[in-house]
Every structure is written in C-alpha cells, then in structure tokens.
Regions:
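Long, charge-patterned amphipathic alpha-helical coiled-coil/hairpin "stalk" segments used as oligomerization
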Residues: 30-72
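Short cysteine-rich clusters marking metal-coordination/redox-active sites
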Residues: 107-111, 128-131
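Cysteine-rich micro-motifs
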Residues: 121-134
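Long, hydrophobic N-terminal alpha-helical segment
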Residues: 1-3
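A structural-propensity feature for long, helix-poor, extended segments
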Residues: 6-41, 45-48
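Short Cys/His-rich Zn2+-coordinating modules
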Residues: 83-95, 109-114
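Short, non-ligating residues that shape and space the ligands of small metal-coordination modules
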Residues: 116-117, 137-138
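Short, flexible, mixed-charge glycine/proline-rich loop motifs
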Residues: 94-104, 117-122
Length: 139
C-alpha cells in the first residue's frame, strides 16, 4: 500500500491514539481529505479500504507482552514482522460516501460560520452546535 491521493485509500480507525498519526504520515489518510474516518470503539483496530476495488482489510493489534519493558517493546515494534503485532483479515465494509463540501451558514447568536449540516434551528434562529441549548427535560 502506498500513500493515498484524494480518497483512493480510506482508513476507518477505531481509536484516537498515536497509531493514527502514523497512518496520516505514511499513507496520507486525513480527516481533512475525508479518507480518515473515526469510529470510536476504543479498540486498536484499523480498516483499510481501496475505493477502486472495494477490498477491505482490518488490522487488530495483538496484546503486548507484559514482560517487556516500554523501550524494549518500542524496539520490538520497529523490527518484528507485522504478523507478530497485528491480526488481520479481509472483511466486507460498506464503502463510505466521498467527502462532501457543505455551504457555510452564519450562527445568529455568535456570528461564526459553520457547515449547514452542523447547524441547528432554535427559536426560529440558525445556531451552531456551540450555541445550541439542548432540550433534555433532565433525563
């Protein structure tokens, strides 16, 4: 796998840990390009999808050997075969839609712009998510 131009390669990350930084740097997947998607399960798992073929592979990080010191483990990660760090398998994934560019709308409370799909209507005003007051009735 090589770096991704536009959205040719999509990564669905299930965590927000440092491994995501490597994916961005090495493979070129990013939130801004729309080909890095965050699905918060907290697992050390990453699914890579090729848009041209629909082929998807999910990597899941194996448990760390508790007997290894931190520095020893880091060195091990740099030198060992990928099979010792990750379980991986082909999987079926619904291809996510390509990133869309939304029109910006000005919040009628704070005056800041936000994409229209993130705006809310409250008391007849278009408001951003920061200014929106959730109605919960306390439960």
């Amino acid at each position: 796998v090589t770096g991704s131009k536009d959205e040719a390669l999509v990564c669905i990350t299930e965590n927000d840990a440092c491994g995501v930084d490597a994916i961005q740097a090495v493979l070129g997947c990013s939130l801004g390009k729309g080909n890095l998607l965050y699905r918060n399960t907290g697992k050390s798992a990453y699914t890579f999808i090729r848009r041209d073929t629909g082929r998807a592979v999910r990597f899941y990080m194996k448990k760390r050997n508790p007997g290894m010191e931190k520095e020893e483990y880091y060195q091990y990660l740099l030198e060992c075969p990928v099979e010792e760090v990750f379980d991986y398998k082909e999987t079926q994934v619904q291809l996510p839609e390509r990133a869309r560019i939304f029109r910006n709308v000005t919040c009628e409370i704070c005056g800041e712009d936000a994409p229209e799909h993130r705006m809310r209507l409250q008391d007849g005003k278009k408001v951003c998510m920061d200014c929106f007051k959730e109605y919960t009735r306390g439960w």
